[in-house]
Amino acid sequence: MLTMGEGNVMTSNNRFASPPQQPSSSSPGTIQNPNFNFIPFNSYSSIIPKEEHGMMSMMMMMGDGTVEEMMENGSAGGSFGSGSEQAEDPKFGNESDVNELHDDEQPPPAKKKRYHRHTNRQIQEMEALFKENPHPDDKQRKRLSAELGLKPRQVKFWFQNRRTQMKAQQDRNENVMLRAENDNLKSENCHLQAELRCLSCPSCGGPTVLGDIPFNEIHIENCRLREELDRLCCIASRYTGRPMQSMPPSQPLINPSPMLPHHQPSLELDMSVYAGNFPEQSCTDMMMLPPQDTACFFPDQTANNNNNNNMLLADEEKVIAMEFAVSCVQELTKMCDTEEPLWIKKKSDKIGGEILCLNEEEYMRLFPWPMENQNNKGDFLREASKANAVVIMNSITLVDAFLNADKWSEMFCSIVARAKTVQIISSGVSGASGSLLLMFAELQVLSPLVPTREAYFLRYVEQNAETGNWAIVDFPIDSFHDQMQPMNTITHEYKRKPSGCIIQDMPNGYSQVKWVEHVEVDEKHVHETFAEYVKSGMAFGANRWLDVLQRQCERIASLMARNITDLGVISSAEARRNIMRLSQRLVKTFCVNISTAYGQSWTALSETTKDTVRITTRKMCEPGQPTGVVLCAVSTTWLPFSHHQVFDLIRDQHHQSLLEVLFNGNSPHEVAHIANGSHPGNCISLLRINVASNSWHNVELMLQESCIDNSGSLIVYSTVDVDSIQQAMNGEDSSNIPILPLGFSIVPVNPPEGISVNSHSPPSCLLTVGIQVLASNVPTAKPNLSTVTTINNHLCATVNQITSALSNTITPVIASSADVSNQEVS
């Protein structure tokens, strides 16, 4: 026991009892500190609630004057919900009394404070208002105080106390849940550790190695084992008389097709006469393309094993990815439905009208990304666009196409060079809704002058339960794997911000599609011919995606049609579909062959920057393509004509004989026609070339597909023999039919610098011509220089013939721009 004062003993009975009231502070009944002569304790209620203990201690430290003010305002005493106030004490009722109290060294003990609670009606009224608005303004507080007979400060502090009480309750509930979750995680961790100790090796049955093994030790051990295996294979081959294959490199996470060819040795093509000292790589380092009739594959990944190890998402990252996916769907929906101020219209001197642009400041305010500041370093440019259209396909079929990488790349073959589903993170709870995929894609422009865009991204699909609309959103993965880079070494960087589409079903199998395309890209090596085309968003913008989607949906609808009455030489609907599939492979092969997809490198034939001719070589030895060495040449020319005019002239049979590289001056005759869209230019034709060498057993045929939309047009050809066409129409496998496509790509562009634009002037276009020839039937052959000269002459002649025909039949947009149109290679 502790003895204090004059023998007063502190016990459990009198520890919290109020001291007796004495007339003088020097009375022996007053408890004083024997060493410091502190002010005596004041009397308090015998029971102080736990919630009020901290506030009463604070009141003691602030002094009586502050205590009196707080008591008067109802901010102290009682519970937070009661709103009780202290009755005014005459001893401490004014400022003079407070001053006298400070002057007196030992003031008499204060009288016991009296408290009273608010009435039930007052509490009910304030509770009702609190449920509606926990933060009332001054007018509401004054009105409520007048109705309840309270002071405004009392109402103010009651609401403060009530909010504090609610916050404390929420914190306590959250702490309880966190503790429970922590206990569950600890239990699960213990369970997993126990299972880990019991694991055994599936090969030898021995126990697993506990602890982490350094990566460099594993790498050294693997190298040693491979050297030992190679040595044993060499010894075994001496005794067996046949070569023994050692163990192949470890398979990557994404297994390429067995048909995928590896990089072939150099063709050793001497290009020193044409190639000068410029940064383009030599054509002696060209790679062979994979067969295009199968799904899109990755190139050889032996140099990217470290990348593959970091590719997949761990379990804890999957949870974060799902949270990001839900927020990205909300962002996409808001970007589709919101106009100004998120999207603003700006005048464009290039097109002579207005364009829709994203307000970056408003976007950053509405959708702050945690990694935004780090990713915006360097020369990143933001490309954002949105559009909407109606397509002839229901939402279920569209969603299925977007979730299947092969179908997606097939539908957008002019944009998507290849695509792959890397990992299925979530397959959805009910149907496709809730599916989350990790994907890789390479996007292309149909020209070797524009580098492709490669990116890993997450694709999430969600259906709105109320409206039934589908949301398909792509968002970047760099928040999970900052070190993940595209597999090919490229000179630019590309990242997909939340982009995608909202699909709404309409009657008769149609769908309303709203599309938003939002990316950040660092383009450094786009040729000046395509610089404005790419920068304006016409190459990868939302309008281009929707234009291609509309056209492809019409093509698929035509492919599935069964009520075709006039089939011509095509005997059945099944034969019609087989010809359409063969033609689709023709277009897809052409698109990939004339771009920089799959890491193709191209060589320029001149040192001038305005030269747009590029050549490349490939060794072909796979089914579906002719065997041997293929030489490909591509050239791009600006023309002062609309892409519709150029498209119509090339398709016109009266002018097709001018294309010597295609028909050798002979006029073609259409023997079969398949319409695959509402536009008459969207069709497949089987052409018979009228030459003297034709006979009943030797007929030259050419398969042609043409397609056009607002984003551009394509015309692709390939010679085929009669037996191959008959094989396709009979329903046999057409993937082995060798095709070597050549053709034209036409895209609308804005006029170049220095040319005025008015509202009556149609847009100009870029004409890209791609020609492929089989230089040799032997894959190991080395094409000579004359082959390169020949294909270059054919290319220049084709461009000149088209330009001359356009100038003679169509009035150009700008008469004084003839000099600009002469930029084709001479």
Swiss-Prot record:
Its main location: nucleus. Residues 23-34 have a biased composition (Low complexity). Residues 1-34, 69-119 are annotated as: Disordered. It comes from the Eukaryota. Residues 88-105 have a biased composition (Basic and acidic residues). Keywords: Coiled coil, DNA-binding, Homeobox, Nucleus, Transcription, Transcription regulation. GO terms for molecular function: DNA binding; DNA-binding transcription factor activity; DNA-binding transcription factor activity, RNA polymerase II-specific; lipid binding. Belongs to the HD-ZIP homeobox family. Class IV subfamily. This is Homeobox-leucine zipper protein HDG5. It comes from Arabidopsis thaliana (Mouse-ear cress).
